Regions:
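A short, acidic, flexible beta-alpha connecting loop/helix-capping segment that sits on the rim
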Residues: 70-71, 179-185, 196
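Outer-membrane beta-barrel "beta-signal"
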Residues: 46, 167, 195-207
Length: 207
C-alpha cells in the first residue's frame, strides 16, 4: 500500500559505477505471457540513487521510472514514476515515498493486462518512522494507493497502517510483533468498504 511493487525487476541491467554516492541502473524485462495475454514489446525500467552521510546523519534519495506497452484487447502504454527519500539521525530513521502512474493499477504488477477497467491513473504514497532503543526497534508506517479513470465508476483506494516492535536476539533471529489495519473502498471492487485488522507475533530467521 503506497508503493510500486515489486521495485526494480529488469532481467538485463546496466549499472553505473558509484561516483560520490550516486549510481544509476537501467534495464529491460519481458513478461511475454501473463495469464493468457501477450506483450509484444519488452518493458523498460530505470533507477537512480544518491547516498550521503555527515556525522551522525545519513540518508538516501532515489527516483525510478517504468514503461511497457500492453497488448490484447485494448492495448495501451503503461508507465510510472517514483521518488523517495530516507534519512537517519542517530537512533531515528524516516522514509517518505510517492509515485504517479498510468495503466499500472493499484498493485502496479502486470500492467493491468487482465483488468476490465482499461487504462487507469494511479498514485500513492508511503511514510514510515522508526526509533531504536538498544536492540529493540519501534516503528509506525502508513500508505495509500488510489486508482481512477478508465472504465472505473469510482476512485478505488487501499490504505494500510502498521505499528511494530522488532527485537534482535542475535544476528540471526529477530522477534517481531505487529498490529496492522487495512481499509479498501471503491464500488468497482467492493460492495461496501473492506476493513481488516491483524495482530501478528513471530520471528525472522536470517542466514
Amino acid at each position: 500500500h503506497g508503493y510500486m511493487y515489486t521495485g526494480f525487476q529488469p532481467q538485463i541491467t546496466y549499472t553505473t559505477p558509484a561516483l560520490g554516492g550516486f549510481s544509476a541502473s537501467a534495464g529491460i524485462f519481458d513478461p511475454n505471457k501473463f495469464a493468457g495475454d501477450e506483450t509484444k514489446d519488452p518493458g523498460f525500467q530505470a533507477m537512480a540513487n544518491y547516498d550521503w552521510a555527515s556525522g551522525a546523519a545519513k540518508g538516501s534519495l532515489w527516483a525510478g521510472a517504468i514503461h511497457q506497452r500492453t497488448s490484447g484487447a485494448g492495448s495501451f502504454n503503461a508507465s510510472g514514476f517514483e521518488l523517495g527519500a530516507k534519512i537517519g539521525i542517530g537512533a531515528f530513521e524516516a522514509v517518505a515515498y510517492g509515485f504517479d502512474a498510468s495503466g499500472l493499477g493499484l498493485s502496479t504488477v502486470g500492467a493491468l493486462y487482465l483488468s476490465p477497467f482499461g487504462k487507469t491513473d494511479g498514485k500513492g504514497y508511503f511514510v514510515q518512522t522508526t526509533y531504536t532503543v538498544g536492540k529493540t526497534k519501534f516503528g509506525i508506517n502508513f500508505g495509500e494507493n488510489r486508482d481512477s479513470g478508465g472504465a472505473l465508476a469510482d476512485t478505488n483506494k487501499f490504505r494500510s497502517a502498521t505499528v511494530g516492535v522488532y527485537h534482535s536476539l542475535n544476528k540471526y533471529i529477530t522477534l517481531v510483533g505487529e498490529y496492522n489495519q487495512e481499509k479498501g473502498d471503491g464500488d468497482d471492487l467492493f460492495a461496501g468498504d473492506l476493513k481488516t485488522r491483524t495482530i501478528s507475533v513471530g520471528g525472522i530467521l536470517m542466514f
